[in-house]
Amino acid sequence: MEAGATLGSGGDVVDISTERTMGLIGSILALAGIIPRVGGLLSLIGFVLILIALHGIGNKLNDGRPFNYYLKAIIAIFVALIVGVVVIAAAFVVSSGSTSSIENEFIMSPGSEITIIEEESPHLTGEGIALLVIGAGIILAGIIVGGYFQKKAWESMYKLTGVEAFQNTAKFLWWGVLTIVILIGAILLLISEIYQIIAFANLPEKLTKRPETHLKPPIDDFEW
């Protein structure tokens, strides 16, 4: 279905050109997160711009689902990262008193023996390893939950606008999240980011406003 199919369908036409531009710039900045050093800051700015764009589009089209889903995704990922990093840091704290050393023995002359300690390195205890695994699991779980909500956000945008690239964004993002532990996951996420840029670039500047609805969201929307 083409994006223009939502125009002239018997409703008020609204201008979303500003939101389109913000979403496009935000998506480009989010992709720039792969740049060393400044990537994190650029991604953060990009996510904020995308949130603002989705909020504006939702208000103008009487549908807040894209914004709500995307906001939940950001919260889930952020909280999981904070908690996961704290747990991983605790793993090294509880293991800080445990060290291992490498020893070499040399016989210099008959009857004499010299032991040289080459290095001493931190050693994770059983508790430390357990905390390390738990922390990594929390981060991975947050990424999956966040990916689910992002998928729902882009699927909602596809239903609202008819821009098929949003549907492709959701599809590649979800499979990328599920395979994030292997290389193909990163490739799929990159493809998803590219489709996201294409989606906002193809988004028309004007869309037909939908009538307000007070229907209760379906249960599978995974709301909290």
Label the model's feature ranges:
Residues 2-33, 42-81, 116-126, 142-180, ...:
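Membrane-interface extramembranous regions at the lipid-water interface
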Residues 85-109, 201:
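Functional transmembrane-helix hotspots
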Residues 102-123:
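Low-complexity, acidic polar-rich segments
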Residues 128-140:
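Alpha-helical transmembrane segments
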